[in-house]
Amino acid sequence: MARTGALLLAALALAGCAQACIYKFGTSPDSKATHTGDHWDHSLNGENWEGKDGAGNPWVCKTGRKQSPINVPQYHVLDGKGSKIATGLQTQWSYPDLMSNGSSVQVINNGHTIQVQWTYDYAGHATIAIPAMRNQSNRIVDVLEMRPNDASDRVTAVPTQFHFHSTSEHLLAGKIFPLELHIVHKVTDKLEACKGGCFSVTGILFQLDNGPDNELLEPIFANMPTREGTFTNLPAGTTIKLGELLPSDRDYVTYEGSLTTPPCSEGLLWHVMTQPQRISFGQWNRYRLAVGEKECNSTETDAAHADAGHHHHHHRRLLHNHAHLEEVPAATSEPKHYFRRVMEETENPDAYTCTTVAFGQNFRNAQYANGRTIKLARYE
């Protein structure tokens, strides 16, 4: 009965939305993005992420004990005995420039973030310490428990994409930053547990600066699509200096965490750089417009809605979780028919024109540390 009531409330809300509605990032009806599993967005910053992936597996966003992001403690807390990563066990990064040939590097608006991907064999990598003596139970996060004199080997972590969040997802001693970049790496060698792929993420924070634009961000920010589910090929000869986006001071905090978006899978090794890079006010505003809120109008004719007696302006993804309405017990069949009709009428994203009208955001709230090991690496 409660579910039926929720459907009726949603129906009333949707019906009350006349020719123009405001949609948060990830819910725009003109989106060309395709998704598997249950739909999600950042409207509640992850507090409502309960659902399943495309294979029917439940997300662990609300049940996991090692979730990301976190509030990184003060330096003096991490400088205590046993809370440092020894120099010989610290992660090393090597990122040559990304170079576009006109179609090999793409800036993507996927409805959740602005993401950069490439289609060629990029030579960049990070190397992560692991125990020299291993067994099938060893994991990518074992470096957190290694002692300074432990015999070690290294695995190679290959970057597969990077993307942004605003505001920052990680906090440094409670401080929030305007932007955070995540470089996602995949590890497939040496560790038995990683044959299917293990992941490590490097987080880079950005702080506002009164100076000019950060030229390292410009090749990306100058090519950000604003329509969800679309991408831009960087022009031929365009270079992204990924290595220079890493701070010159490579101090970092590392811990075991998760993806910061559904399904929120755990077992990732996180590195959060403690020295922020800079971003101008103008660049921050441009990013927030790229993930901004949209006012959308239907371009369909009134006749298409004549049978309903009023105009509809809906988003099919808003109704994604009601795909099986025939299973909903109801005192009346009207909610079923109403929502089925809405879904049928809103399958065409080109039936809408959308304009950005407000800054947006795409961050997840900080999660409880739950007693996890968090270590500081002082880069020397």
UniProtKB/Swiss-Prot annotation:
**What are the names of the required cofactors?**
Zn(2+)
User: Which of this chain's residues are annotated to bind Zn(2+)?
Assistant: 163, 165, 182
Signal sequence extent: 1-20
Q: Fetch the Gene3D superfamilies from UniProt.
A: Alpha carbonic anhydrase
Give me the residues that bind substrate, please: 260-261
Name the UniProt key words of this record, in alphabetical order.
Disulfide bond, Glycoprotein, Lyase, Metal-binding, Periplasm, Signal, Zinc
Q: Which CDD domains match?
A: alpha_CA_prokaryotic_like (cd03124)
Record keyword Glycoprotein present: yes
Query: What are its E.C. numbers?
Result: 4.2.1.1
Q: Which GO terms describe its molecular function?
A: carbonate dehydratase activity; zinc ion binding
**What PROSITE patterns does the annotation carry?**
ALPHA_CA_1, ALPHA_CA_2
State the conditions that upregulate or repress this gene: Expressed under high-CO2 condition.
List of glycosylated residues:
101, 135, 297
Active site, UniProt feature: 112
User: Catalysed reaction per UniProt?
Assistant: hydrogencarbonate + H(+) = CO2 + H2O
Please state every residue range assigned to the domain named Alpha-carbonic anhydrase: 38-322
Show the InterPro entries listed in the entry: Alpha_CA_prokaryot-like, CA_dom, CA_dom_sf, Carbonic_anhydrase_a-class, Carbonic_anhydrase_a-class_CS
Localization recorded for this chain is: Periplasm
Subunit structure of this entry? Answer: Tetramer of two large and two small subunits linked by two disulfide bonds.
Function of the molecule: Reversible hydration of carbon dioxide.
UniProt name for this protein: Carbonic anhydrase 2
Gene name for this UniProt entry: CAH2
